[in-house]
């Protein structure tokens, strides 16, 4: 019996290479579709992938055809309506079922749907946060040299002889030999029983006995021909070099929860911070996050309370800045940590407090921060806090401020604030 062993490395995902090539080729169109999807789905929904639509015109293959100019004569079969010299009216515009046209429906004309396919959760998040990074991330003074440490990472089918795993290789060998010879051994046992029965019969059946002995000999030879060890059985210990963290970073999230922040404004702020939190967890393994909520008083809270607490009150923004400064001094030495902050507010603040905020940022926070981002969520004209912060933007390169007017602005503003710097 013939034995077929599938040793293809691609396994169940035999079109993975074609899929990767397609995604590389149409990366820009896919990224545009993912950016549009951010506004359609909940930002916290990262358990599933996303349906991506690419306009049919963008995936057309190039082709050679005759140009529009020149004179040509053609014979169209079945014509009983036109004669030489007649001008044929162009078909009226119509769209396919999934087209994006704005014209009216028509009984004439043809169109084609957009090409739609699904990307996985990991592909969605990779595309969402591609080209983003924490600005000005520097190595701290304590860990100036990147150290590497080897970690065991399972087994692989190729490697150095010194890394061979004898036990795992013999297990693979035993499994292969069992699979390839189990059927033959079962048949051999049956033939040996049959031979014993024939040998004990009277009169002796020499011809049948010789035939069975020949079959038994061939089976034993086939069983013995199964190699004890094969290159397919070899397993090598796999080691991966992982960098010891050389850059420690902390992100402070400061959110205004005062009474002037209505529910829609708070929802936009929370969505921005959820996006920031996902970005940090997806891109960096060793970034700590400190959550601060404030109204007239500021308080450090955990992740759950930051996003779901209903506490509210008046507005004194400087309380959050003071608390951040206290936490930095107590837990995050400037020489050892890269310090970042993202502040969200509707811009409504006690008038006398806005200059105080500017003073705190100028003298205490911005000199110690790698990057400080301020987003103001409002459709109204800006107030004193925005105008004070504008002076900071002129003086400090590590300070950025943006205005968010609606949910649709969240992702574009986020990308502007954290776009990866190019060398």
UniProtKB/Swiss-Prot annotation:
Ranges of Gly residues composition bias in the record: 93-102
Pfam families xrefs: DUF444 (PF04285)
InterPro entries recorded: UPF0229
Region described as Disordered: spans on this chain: 81-111
UniProt superkingdom: Bacteria
Family: Belongs to the UPF0229 family.
Name of protein: UPF0229 protein VV1_2091
Organism in which the protein naturally occurs: Vibrio vulnificus (strain CMCP6)
Lineage of the organism: Bacteria, Pseudomonadati, Pseudomonadota, Gammaproteobacteria, Vibrionales
